[in-house]
Amino acid sequence: MEKDLDYTMKFEGIPEDRMSVGDTIDFVYKALVEKGYNPINQIIGYLLSGDSSYITSHKNARAIIKKFERDEILEEVITHYLNRK
């Protein structure tokens, strides 16, 4: 069967409305790295200040992280850290 070379496949990834807090942190981290930012510093800046301009709009990361409250994100980070030990 011959493939239609004029057709472009599109991979959607994880739908934004189904992302967990952990998935969101990973997604935003990767978007920040792709844009050349220090992701740890940028995420800390956002969590401390609430200023979403610390998060890139690349890949819609800024809008995605704002779907969660900052305390939910901190809870996920701390829980993940404590469960590693």
From Swiss-Prot:
Pfam families: IreB
Cited InterPro entries: IreB
Domain of life, source organism: Bacteria
Family indicated by similarity: Belongs to the UPF0297 family.
Name by which UniProt lists this protein: UPF0297 protein CD630_12830
Protein species of origin: Clostridioides difficile (strain 630) (Peptoclostridium difficile)
Organism ancestry: Bacteria, Bacillati, Bacillota, Clostridia, Peptostreptococcales
